[in-house]
From Swiss-Prot:
Similarity field: Belongs to the ATPase B chain family.
Leftover remarks: In plastids the F-type ATPase is also known as CF(1)CF(0).
Subcellular location: Plastid, Chloroplast thylakoid membrane
Pfam families the record matches: ATP-synt_B
Keyword Chloroplast: yes
PANTHER family the record matches: ATP SYNTHASE SUBUNIT B, CHLOROPLASTIC (PTHR34264:SF3)
Annotated keywords: ATP synthesis, CF(0), Chloroplast, Hydrogen ion transport, Ion transport, Membrane, Plastid, Thylakoid, Transmembrane, Transmembrane helix, Transport
Function: F(1)F(0) ATP synthase produces ATP from ADP in the presence of a proton or sodium gradient. F-type ATPases consist of two structural domains, F(1) containing the extramembraneous catalytic core and F(0) containing the membrane proton channel, linked together by a central stalk and a peripheral stalk. During catalysis, ATP synthesis in the catalytic domain of F(1) is coupled via a rotary mechanism of the central stalk subunits to proton translocation.
An example Gene Ontology molecular-function term: proton-transporting ATP synthase activity, rotational mechanism
Transmembrane portions of the chain: 27-49
InterPro entries: ATP_synth_b/b'su_bac/chlpt
Protein name stated in the entry: ATP synthase subunit b, chloroplastic
Amino acid sequence: MKNVTDPFLSLSYWPSAGSFGFNTDILATNPINLSVVLGVLIFFGKGVLSDLLDNRKQRILKTIRNSEELREGALEQLEKARSRLRKVEKEADQFRVNGYSEIEREKLNLINSTSKTLEQLENYKNETIHFEQQRAINEVRQRVFQQALEGALGTLNSCLNNELHLRTISTNIGMFGTMKEITD
């Protein structure tokens, strides 16, 4: 335990924010700590993230398939509408003298309603895909953040005793205060 805590005892020997100095304590340098944390996150989070993304992909693909089926149904309805349109056009030729304007209005209404239905189905498909993508992204972000936080807290709690933990927190609070003053 002494070998693990020796580098943390040197925290009190850090140069102040206004002076220049080199920190030779390898465990207290930011790039190494960050690379260790990132390595742990990548190692433990890769499998979970891969599973989450695969599940999300399957859900999105299922939604796309459902939307495609709805689209095919709409295309079938459109084809039926076109065949009815052809039938109406034939009847229009026969009854042109008696009711040409009425048949023309019916034809336009039929085309408009079919186009609106197809457009609504396409919009529904696009909204569903967008919603599922956003939900998947948000879920992945939440889980990665939670795992990163748990991993970091677990690492810190396993390496620090109470006194060192309090000193580290005080030092970090001081550094954040200094950084905030600099940025303000």
